[in-house]
Amino acid sequence: MSKNNEMVSVIISTRKIDSSYYDHVKRMFSHPNTEILMYENDGEMSLTQIYNKGLKESVNDIVVFMHDDLILETSNMTPKIVKLFEKHPEYGIIGIAGTDKLTSGMWWQNRENMFGVVGHIHEGKRHVNHYSKGVF
């Protein structure tokens, strides 16, 4: 069975499904045909097993794997991701943030080769690092 290559399936594993997080993901992808598969997993399955389950159940060719602590700040993600794959059909995978050269094994140590935006919360304070304009 051929899957849909013009839409996106989002696969998320979480210990407890949070409807506000689900709504946030839905808003950021903001396309009526974006499929969001959120699996509640208290540790009985590995993350790989959950992602493989999502791959089997998804209806789209383009699949996004997300951790449940990832907060997206770019909206309208579905058409942006689809356009990126259309522009670069040779791509098999796209990363939102990372580095294109890794020598130490710690991605954050080689700042000149980093791209994207990474945010995190430490001791209740939000931190956002902008490494480049990124693809979105």
At which residue positions do the language-model features occur?
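Conserved donor NDP-sugar-binding/catalytic core segment of glycosyltransferases
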Residues: 71, 75-118
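Glycine-rich, basic loop-to-helix element that forms the pyrophosphate-binding segment
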Residues: 42-58
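Alpha-helical elements of Rossmann-like donor-binding domains used by nucleotide-donor carbohydrate transfer enzymes
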Residues: 20-27, 49, 53, 76-83
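Active-site acidic Asp-centered loop
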Residues: 66-68
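N-proximal low-complexity "stem/linker" segments adjacent to membrane-targeting elements
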Residues: 1-28, 33-38
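Short aromatic/hydrophobic "clamp" motif used to bind/position activated sugar donors
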Residues: 63
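Short, flexible, basic/aromatic active-site loop/helix in glycosyltransferases
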Residues: 113-136
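Preference for well-ordered, secondary-structure-rich cores of eukaryotic proteins
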Residues: 40-41, 71
